[in-house]
Amino acid sequence: MLNTMRDYLAYSGLQYQKPEKAGQDAEKMLYLRSKGQEARKAFTELAKAFQARHPEWILQRSSQWMNQAQRLRPHFWAYLQREGRVTEPMLALRLYGSSSDFGVSLEVSFIERKKDERTLDQQAKVLEVPVVEGIYYLVYSDGESHKMEATEENRQILREKLFHQEVRKVLVKVDVPVTDGQILDKFLDELDKTFDKLLPYYQATRN
């Protein structure tokens, strides 16, 4: 399962075209499609295995392997909803990295296309929780995103920037790298540790 996702990342970003319209590249397109479908299935199985350890959470559908521009996505994601509506912040699993260095991150975030007038204010509450070791912030402003180290100083800076609308949203994330030869259960154990770290940040969005 983990190796299937690793193999797929070597092809992420490549342009896909329906095989029947690809001419001499038809075989290549069939191959890319199979890689995308296999990797999405593997990611979905991973997400289901994680959700089975947290049955109070409802797993949403995994993202498709191809984006609207018909390129192989550089990552997959799946949201987990415990209560409330899909407009509100949830937890999300997200594949990241390259075939030589990859893993799955867990984050407190929301589905952008589902948000309503309250969503951004709810998400901002993650900054009301003191930092813990291992987390980082993903900061969005002016249509771009960048990582920021999670320190108490940066937490206060981001609260100010959100207040003055210099930043649009801040996600709280933890990356869980996949190590060579790692078995699924051990990886899920690491995701569980991450879940425990992030739960207070999710709970803050519920208040």
Where are these regions (language model features)?
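Generic structural hydrophobic/aromatic packing signal, biased to beta-strands
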Residues: 78-80, 104-106, 137-139, 170-174, ...
